[in-house]
Regions:
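A charged, aromatic-enriched C-terminal amphipathic alpha-helix characteristic of glycosyltransferases
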Residues: 25-30, 266, 270-273, 287-323
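Carbohydrate-associated surface elements
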Residues: 99, 121
């Protein structure tokens, strides 16, 4: 486990990261932990794997430098990709979606011949038959990505047989981040707690969240954030939930052909109207034969194509080729 320990130790000790790796359980950090779990130690030999950080000091001259970039071009941690000197010191940049790679090539002029796409992955989710007494919605991503709009839409719908479960908190990125940003969303969380048919759970560890997803019907996500992949959507689809979201960022790439995807409207008012229509349609048609047939195919395909059984082979092959 010497090589894996080296990779994790470097991530843990990287003080230039905006959040502590050890304390953070966001999508990128969780993906690195799962990669470490599913690959043999020898795969990481002579590899310097850098997660979401373009700090020059992280380059190691005696190793193959691989930047694993989950961030959109507007994130501070990606900004140094504008430096040709830094990019020249990298051997490879791994992106989590075609959309994200294309944006980086366009914005930073990243050489195509040193960039590759390896999609995110999940551990397979066993299917549990959904309850039929009511429709349960879930929002299980960070609060700034669309929770305010969802809460407004949910209030306007005012449906007695529909419950909204909110699993959202800034603590997901650790104490330092929570201390800095937590107060910003306190009023929104309080609104969740005081809204009819809404249950606020805060941060849920992934194991608990997966068990909750199995009982949910719809991932209600009016995304206002340029997702570069969206693990929350992948896990929801694998658990048999219908995903109702926007086409912002890589969501179309991630959720097609199964998700109910609406065009992202630039004003909140327009987005609320369009999203309300789409969500209501999804609620009303959830138990239809067509929807159930689609969701069965969805969970089978997503569990198959996004499984670490598949992705670990891709990573092993990539590292082997990178060493040649």
């Amino acid at each position: 486990m010497e090589e894996k320990s080296r990779i994790l130790k470097k991530a843990d000790s990287d003080k230039s990261r905006p959040v502590s790796f050890k304390e953070s359980f966001g999508g990128s950090e969780s993906q690195l932990r799962l990669l470490i779990k599913h690959l043999p130690d020898e795969s990481f030999k002579n590899i310097n794997l850098i997660l979401n950080n373009t700090n020059q000091d992280l380059i190691e001259k005696d190793k193959i430098n691989v930047l694993w970039m989950h961030h959109f071009v507007n994130q501070k941690e990606a900004k140094n990709l504008i430096s040709k000197d830094f990019v020249n010191k990298l051997d490879w940049i791994v992106y989590n979606s075609n959309w994200n790679r294309e944006q980086h090539i366009k914005y930073f002029k990243i050489p195509k011949n040193k960039s590759v796409v390896i999609r995110n992955a999940i551990e397979k989710i066993n299917y549990l038959e959904k309850p039929k007494d009511k429709i349960s919605l879930i929002y299980h991503t960070t609060p700034w990505r669309g929770l305010k709009i969802l809460l407004k839409v949910f209030k306007n719908l005012n449906l007695d047989n529909v419950k909204l479960n909110v699993c959202s908190s800034t603590i997901i990125y650790g104490k330092k981040f929570n201390d800095l940003m937590g107060n910003t969303f306190e009023n929104l969380f309080e609104e969740c707690k005081n809204t009819k048919n809404v249950e606020y759970f805060g941060f849920q560890e992934n194991e608990k969240l997966i068990e909750q997803l199995k009982k949910m019907h719809i991932f209600a996500y009016p995304s206002t954030w340029p997702e570069t992949s969206c693990i929350a959507a992948i896990e929801a689809m694998a658990a048999g939930c219908e995903v109702v979201t926007t086409d912002l960022g890589a969501l179309n790439e991630t959720c097609s052909p199964f998700g109910k995807i609406i065009h992202f409207e630039k004003t909140p008012e327009e987005l609320e109207v369009k999203y309300k229509e789409a969500l209501l349609e999804s609620i009303n048609n959830f138990w239809s034969e067509a929807t159930q047939k689609k969701l069965k195919l969805q969970r089978e395909k997503i569990n198959e194509t996004y499984s670490w059984d598949v992705r670990s082979v891709e990573w092993k092959n990539f590292f082997s080729e990178a060493k040649k």
